[in-house]
């Protein structure tokens, strides 16, 4: 499946400069099921109704991508041909199916054996209300999604086909919103196989949770994870011209608040210029080698003058994934989430985060989320400062970094872990809050959250599941979307949310071990 999905990417939208600024140019095919038993008049109504539904969905303003009507699926040959055309169309990101009439499900077997695009089963019907006074057998034959969709869903279940099922009336906002939400998951499924992670350094020595099977990750997710000597990318940094550095530094100084904290302005600016040079050198190297995510490690900086900080933050803001201390799984997940939220209106941001320290005051419990330097400014709330302070990690010059407070609101924290013979995705709902008091001596960007259902249950279940201290965090996706992505990838997903109970969670972990293989 991964191999065929690789054809689906619309290359031009993600390889031009500043590659997350353009809306992905994908479409979703609407395939209505019927059969020729009912005659031409009925089939003409089926086609007309399907076109009307597609037009309504596209005009709703709720869908992030266009829906494309396809001729009615009435035979095995038509279904098989259409699905293979979907496989080979690089603009098709998924298929939406609906049975207007009864559609014998054996006709769908060969097509679904060959379909390699994400699938949503929209269980709806053309008419909202039963026409009590006029309904006759002709109407019954023509409008029997309640019948046809059950037949269709049966064969999908028998074949073990992963799909999203959406139930409701096609004009209702909640149905359109569910379809829109699934579209973003489908983009994640399709685009996953285009994620390439550049490792500028190996895993932090003796750390367990950031390790993982890169071959299995490519088999499961399509991710390519490659290592480059740090001094090779350092050469790309050194090759950046001073004039280019000056232009970018000027941009920094116009965009961010400069916080000298007693440092000499010229000396401060030189430290900032090092990060500008790193940003330009890293980005050019990533573009040249066609990578969309990067990992670094403070223990392996080679000829780099500073630990990349502001530079990495800016790259994440542009859409690149990042993981610290060699954490390629987080880098890939951050990239994935940024793809899934591309073009989202009022997006609040996505970033790598790390659990740092707790507040254990009763009624005020929470976790400070930060890192030494590298938090994405898309999650910032209010002014962003550039600060330059000493950092013992890395034994290099004082690195410049962006410092800010994060937005409040609901988000999800995810941790993809390698359990030895399989992957598990842990998904936790969190409530992001403002810190109670300022942190004047902490020169990092921060987030502060309380995990659901409460600090104690949320933390205990995270530990039971084996969750990492690094997370891929976003305000803009839901646990359902990420769980659907995990299901499409064939891996376990565990949820920690407002309804989580310790006893039930332990049972879910035990059942997951049995199902996915302990």
Task: Describe each PLM feature range.
Residues 21-45, 194-203:
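Short beta-strand segments enriched in small/hydrophobic residues
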Residues 250-251, 255-343:
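Long, internal scaffold/assembly segments composed of regular secondary structure
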Residues 71-85, 175-177:
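Structural motif
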Residues 319-443:
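C-terminal catalytic subdomain
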């Amino acid at each position: 499946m991964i191999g065929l999905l690789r054809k689906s990417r619309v290359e031009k939208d993600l390889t031009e400069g500043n590659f997350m600024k353009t809306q992905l140019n994908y479409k979703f095919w609407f395939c209505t099921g019927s059969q020729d038993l009912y005659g031409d008049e009925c089939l003409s109504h089926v086609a007309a109704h399907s076109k009307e539904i597609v037009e309504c969905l596209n005009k709703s303003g709720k869908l992030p991508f266009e829906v494309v009507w396809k001729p009615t699926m009435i035979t095995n040959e038509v279904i098989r041909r259409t699905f293979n055309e979907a496989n080979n169309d690089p603009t098709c990101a998924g298929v939406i199916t609906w049975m207007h009439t009864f559609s014998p499900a054996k006709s769908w077997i060969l097509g679904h054996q060959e379909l390699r695009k994400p699938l949503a089963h929209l269980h709806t019907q053309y008419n909202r209300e039963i026409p009590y006074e006029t309904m006759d057998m002709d109407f019954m034959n023509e409008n029997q999604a309640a019948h046809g969709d059950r037949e269709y869903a049966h064969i999908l279940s028998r074949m073990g086909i992963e799909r999203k099922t959406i139930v409701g009336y096609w004009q209702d906002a909640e149905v359109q919103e569910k379809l829109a939400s699934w579209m973003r998951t489908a983009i994640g499924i399709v685009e996953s196989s285009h994620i390439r992670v550049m490792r500028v350094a190996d895993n932090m020595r003796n750390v367990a949770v950031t390790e993982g099977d890169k071959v299995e990750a490519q088999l499961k997710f399509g991710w390519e994870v490659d290592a480059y000597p740090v001094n090779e990318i350092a050469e790309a940094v050194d090759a950046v011209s001073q004039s280019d550095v000056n232009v970018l530094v000027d941009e920094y100084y116009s965009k961010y608040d400069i916080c000298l904290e007693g440092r000499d302005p010229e000396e401060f600016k030189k430290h900032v210029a090092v990060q500008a040079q790193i940003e330009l050198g890293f980005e050019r190297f990533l573009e040249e080698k066609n990578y969309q995510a990067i990992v670094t490690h403070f223990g392996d900086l080679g000829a780099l003058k500073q630990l990349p900080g502001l530079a990495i933050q800016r790259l994440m803001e542009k859409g690149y994934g990042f993981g610290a201390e060699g954490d390629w799984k987080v880098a890939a997940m951050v990239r994935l989430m940024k793809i899934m939220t591309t073009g989202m209106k009022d997006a609040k941001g996505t970033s790598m985060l790390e659990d740092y320290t707790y507040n254990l005051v009763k009624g005020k419990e929470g976790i400070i989320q930060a890192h030494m330097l590298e938090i994405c400014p898309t999650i910032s709330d209010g002014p962003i400062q550039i600060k330059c302070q000493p950092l013992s990690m890395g034994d290099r010059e004082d690195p410049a970094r962006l410092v800010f407070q994060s937005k409040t609101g609901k988000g999800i924290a995810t941790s993809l872990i390698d359990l030895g013979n399989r992957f598990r995705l842990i998904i936790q709902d969190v409530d992001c809050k403002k810190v109670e008091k300022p942190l004047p001596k902490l020169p990092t960007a921060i987030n502060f959250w309380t995990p659901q259902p409460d600090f104690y249950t949320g933390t205990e279940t995270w530990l039971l599941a084996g969750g990492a201290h690094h997370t891929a965090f976003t305000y803009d996706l839901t646990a359902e979307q990420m769980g659907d992505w995990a299901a499409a990838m064939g891996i376990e997903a565990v949820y920690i949310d407002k309804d989580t109970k310790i006893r039930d969670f332990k049972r879910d972990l035990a059942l997951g071990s049995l199902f996915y293989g302990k």
